[in-house]
Amino acid sequence: MSTSKTKLSPIIAGTMNWGVWDKNLSVKEMNHLIHLCTENNITSFDHADIYGGYTTEAQFGKAFSESKIERSAIQLISKCGIQMVADNRSTTIKHYNYSKEHIIWSVENSLKNLHTDYLDVLLLHRPSPLMQADEIAEAISKLKTEGKIIDFGLSNFTSSQTELIRKNCAVQFNQIQFSATQLEPMLDGSLDYMQLHNIQPMSWNPLGTVFREDSEQTRRLKKLFAQLVTKYGVGSDTLLLAWVIRHPAQVLPVAGTVNIARIQQLMKAASLELSLEDWFAIWTESIGKNIP
């Protein structure tokens, strides 16, 4: 069980595709989407400073401000550390920066963009070979003391990298890539480690490659889902999320869809109980052979 102070929704809305990187939603459309998510009990929103080339946070913030939704009714997650080459930045090469000054500056900039006084969760976006654990801990301590972040976590960190950060700084979350087509975290000890240390996993790309690639693996899974959607009365996407949620590490899927009909169905995954054999059937079809 996570030691976090923040209670996140069982499904998290991922905003990476809301802006110019993909759907290019207007502020009005984002406003509508925020309302739609919260009306369907998806109250946690996953951001990163870099999304939309450093523009999506500000668009979301304006939409949220206009939505008139109470700040306490939602949870805002954001990430920092990746430095991208962009028109609105002086960066000359993509790199990672986890200096105390940069972490604090990034958080304060995200707060301004998101029209909020605090982040519910701050994540370090990707590990850097040059990160100094003590310096990171100082930044997080200062931000927590000032009430600018409530909880702290990581993203894409291995167990050993997490252990390094945990040395002087409590870690409540780690956002990793985990799905029915990306099985490594449940096989390499990552999810076991998080359970041992009360770190709650978030899963980005929780639908995996099922809808994005045509491969032997995805064809096997789609054939199985053709049977399971009838049995459970939900779509394949909901089944994929339910498979992720079934893991005892209490994984929180980050769903990036902006499809209205799909959003209205997503929360069914949180209450859907896949049978033991169906859960293993999905694993079996993913690897194309019986499990060991």
Q: For each of these PLM feature ranges, what is it?
A:
Residues 25-29, 55, 59, 94-102, ...:
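Alpha-helix N-cap and loop-to-helix initiation/capping positions
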Residues 6-11, 41-44, 70-74, 116-120, ...:
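Short, well-ordered coil/turn segments that N-cap beta-strands
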Residues 71-98:
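Structural motif corresponding to the early beta-alpha repeats
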Residues 24-37, 98-114, 158-162:
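Short, acidic/polar
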Residues 44-51, 123, 150-153, 175-176:
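Short catalytic-loop micro-motif centered on adjacent basic/acidic residues
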Residues 111-130:
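Active-site groove signature of glycoside hydrolases
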Residues 1-75, 117:
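N-terminal binding-site loop/beta-alpha segment at the start of enzyme catalytic domains
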